[in-house]
Swiss-Prot record:
Residues 409-418 have a biased composition (Low complexity). Residues 365-387, 437-449 have a biased composition (Pro residues). It comes from Mycobacterium tuberculosis (strain ATCC 25618 / H37Rv). This is Uncharacterized membrane protein Rv3835. Has been detected in culture filtrate but no signal sequence is predicted by bioinformatic programs. The lineage of its organism: Bacteria, Bacillati, Actinomycetota, Actinomycetes, Mycobacteriales.
Length: 449
């Protein structure tokens, strides 16, 4: 956290100036009891465009999974935004796209332009002068934007600026987060400052930025951390936050290793099944080695790993992290405290390991499987359908004898139709006529004698 002066400035002509004869120097350590007033020294505000928290006067950009406007509003309400001084760091106005900034821990107002080959905390993608925007929102007499509006401006301006800056090297799942740096309320009011810097940073523990070397487009942007790193959790949404924290603090995941896909796939992006098989095997081995002599099943945690998308692969990312954690049934994540290799707590309770599987059950001898001897199908299954000569005869049922050969049925069933004796009446129709045929009419009278 940035430091505030213990005494208010006494120079009425310049509220941002320190008392006469004293140098403006930050005090060591967080001291804000009396600093939440408009007379605080110059500060810079850093905002994460993709995740999270508007920070006033300190560098605590936390890239969360998804946006968290509720946390933003709650944080500002509980810790009002300190005003910044009217005097602006000279580097702030001289910086250009591609420049890199470095500052001591917690003092972004002391940012200086350095070579990107050296350690730095911020890479500038674009310097945006909001005075060029239409309307009166950024006019000379306009009030400073609210924290929620600053969040919105950052999302609208900085994400597009970073995409333009990196081009095909933009990795949407990069370990670097899109951020905004601006001078703050007092510079807005007293100096008419309307400039903001959109760029990239690497969030680190204790709400600080990790220093890195080289330009983002030229280095591996893979979102990985050393084994043993714990990643935070958003207490409001129960979602992971890709920021390292102390494992003794609440967190969502613990990193157990990293896998380099280029070792197996040096050329084109492998398919999802190919990635999954390779990463799963490698992560399983690494996690077993990381937890030894413990076993993953005794922690009741789950092995977690991502795969790479085409945009990430095109940007040059090749490495993924293996982690362990626990998900909830509602889509959230369990809150872990302490390392999985120690006194782990899951949602405040120690894990209850499942019963051990006896060794003899893990190595059961193979059981010989005796297949039944195939039997010939019974003759009844080979019977043909009822012959056409009988199946349509009215009031006559086909004769089916399963135990007889099928060829003996055809003549037997067809014989009655040809050899049936005629009825007693000599004038009846032939035997081939249907029994239900129309009866003969009355006999003609004998001719007269």
């Amino acid at each position: 956290m940035l430091d505030a002066p213990e005494q208010d400035p006494v120079d009425p002509g310049d509220p941002a100036s320190p008392p006469h004869g004293e140098a403006e120097q930050p005090l060591p350590g967080p001291r804000w009891p009396r600093a939440l007033r408009a007379s605080a020294t110059r500060r810079a505000l850093l905002l994460t465009a993709l995740g999270g928290l508007l920070i006033a006067g300190l560098v605590t950009a936390i890239p969360a999974v998804g946006r968290a406007p509720e946390r933003l509003a709650g944080y500002i309400a509980s810790n009002p935004v300190p005003s910044t001084g009217a005097k602006i760091n000279a580097s702030f106005n001289r910086v250009a796209s591609g420049d890199c900034l470095m500052w001591p821990d917690g003092t972004p107002e002391s940012a200086a332009i350095v070579s990107c080959a050296d350690e730095h905390r911020f890479e500038v993608a674009e310097s945006i002068d909001m005075r060029t925007f239409p309307g009166m929102e950024y006019g000379q007499n306009a009030a400073p934007p609210s924290p929620a509006r600053i969040q919105q401006i950052s999302e609208e301006q900085c994400e597009a600026a970073v995409r333009r800056y990196l081009g095909t090297k933009f990795d949407p799942n990069s370990k670097f987060t899109i951020s905004m740096l601006w001078p703050g309320d007092r510079a807005w009011r007293q100096a008419g400052e309307r400039r903001m810097l959109c760029g990239l940073q690497s969030p680190g523990p204790n709400n600080q930025q990790l220093a890195f070397k080289g330009k983002v487009a030229d280095i591996d942007q893979s979102k990985v951390w050393p084994a043993g790193t714990c990643l935070g959790i958003d207490a409001t949404t129960n979602q992971p936050i890709d920021v390292p924290v102390d494992c003794a603090a609440p967190h969502a995941m613990e990193v157990s290793g990293t896998v380099n896909l280029a070792e197996r796939f040096p050329d084109a992006l492998p398919s999802e099944p190919e990635q999954d098989g390779f990463i799963k095997d490698a992560c399983t081995r690494m996690t077993d080695a990381y937890l030894a002599p413990l076993k993953l099943r005794t922690t009741t945690l789950t092995l977690i790993y991502p795969t790479l998308t085409l945009p990430s692969w095109s940007a040059g990312s090749r490495v993924v992290a293996c982690s362990i954690g626990a998900t909830l049934g509602n889509g959230g994540w369990a809150t872990l405290v302490n390392s999985a290799k120690g006194a782990l707590l899951i949602n405040g309770q120690p894990p209850v390991p499942p019963p051990d599987i006896p060794e003899e059950r893990l190595n059961l001898p193979p059981i010989p499987l005796q297949l039944p001897t195939p039997r010939p199908a019974p003759p009844a299954q080979q019977l043909p359908s009822t012959p056409p000569g009988t199946q349509h005869l009215p009031a006559q049922q086909p004769v089916v004898t399963p135990t007889r050969p099928p060829e003996s049925h055809a003549p037997a069933s067809a014989a009655p139709a040809e050899t049936q004796p005629p009825p007693p009446d000599a004038g009846a129709p032939p035997a081939t006529q249907s029994p239900e045929a129309t009866p003969p009419g009355p006999a003609e009278p004998a001719p007269a004698g």
